[in-house]
Amino acid sequence: MLGCFFFFFIQYKVQVEIFVFKVHYLREDTPFPKMVVDVDALANEAIGLLDQCKDDNYRVCILIVGPPGSGKSTVAQDLSRQINHRFDEYRLQGNQKSAHGGTRSRASDVALASDVPEITTPLSEELAFNGGILPKYVEDVNFQPVKRRLENGDLQILGRGGLPNAFTISNDVEPDEESSFAQIVPMDGFHLSRQCLSSFQNPQEAHKRRGSPPTFDSNNFAQLCKTLAQTCTIKPGSCDAKSCFEFMAKTYDPHFPCIKIPGFDHSLKDPTPDQFCLNGHTRIVILEGLYLLYDKENWQRVHEILQNTGSLLVWYIDIEDHVIEERVAKRHFNSGLADSVEQGRLKFQGNDLLNARLIRKNLVQSGKVVTLRND
């Protein structure tokens, strides 16, 4: 009886805090409603969405978007940490060491990436001959991602960036108790590799402007979002749970498809394959990056694809240029990309600032985007 009261109180507390969160937007003359970053409130909102969608959506997605130096990565990390802490606390209160895995989802009814064509023999040969990249297509934003079956049975999806930016889908999944309830998927794993940039018609400019829209495998990132959207709309099993977390634990599906996604190694300055693994444990996916609301080429599809799932939250972090300039200049200096803070400022002005202004001028227009302040 005491346990039931505790779960009811937590659920009630979350709903009340979500209401308080919603009425504290800063009403200003901007394209989107504004509010100050409050990680606890953001976690409430994310869990509230999951609770609202739980009968029809196995998982939900969150987009955190902002210019370089806006703190989007930190916000995403703090948010995932807060959500995972709350779920772990729930499991401890219920004396649960692992999720139940009691009822199966409808995942077996969904063929992920079924619309992606098989790789052709000539393309496969070109991939092998060029060390895993496709030099002829590295600048082709209209390149159609392709798939191939690996020896272990996994399905690999690759775009114009080739193997460095590929993601894989596995249906033969061993239960992994270490996976997180909320996971971050940074856009960084879709930076075109330096080998790809060297294959551009103007490789010097490509390396100089690394981080600009043409230097990402936007083709395959959009395809990843389509695949994630499919997993969002998979219907979970049914149960009589009274709280959101209880429902998630009881409907955990250990056989849910696993998606392995590339990350980015800053020491190697290149993407790293299979850095992130989203499996049946992952019920909240936090995508963060600069171009997730960019209303041009493949990026413009990201918001629409995920919005159509009915299980999406979008937060755009806005901040003045002079603030992000200082932050990024110091970051360039501290990471060894610039010999001084002043040189870091010049690097920022010649690349990062251009990208930030490009995004502001070309934001997806949606009444469901909330702007955050992170000064």
From Swiss-Prot:
Disulfides per UniProt: none
Among the GO molecular function terms of this UniProt record, one is:
ATP binding
The record's listing under InterPro entries reads: P-loop_NTPase (IPR027417)
Per UniProt, the keywords (alphabetical) are:
ATP-binding, Kinase, Nucleotide-binding, Transferase
Matches recorded under SUPFAM superfamilies: P-loop containing nucleoside triphosphate hydrolases
Q: What is its EC number?
A: 2.7.1.-
Q: Which residues cross the membrane?
A: none
Has keyword Secreted?
Answer: no
What enzyme class is recorded for this protein? transferase
Q: Which residues does the annotation say bind ATP?
A: 66-74
Q: Does the entry feature the keyword Transferase, yes or no? A: yes
Name the family the entry cites.
Answer: Belongs to the YFH7 family.
Function recorded in the entry: ATP-dependent kinase that could be involved in endoplasmic reticulum membrane assembly.
Protein name per UniProt: ATP-dependent kinase YFH7
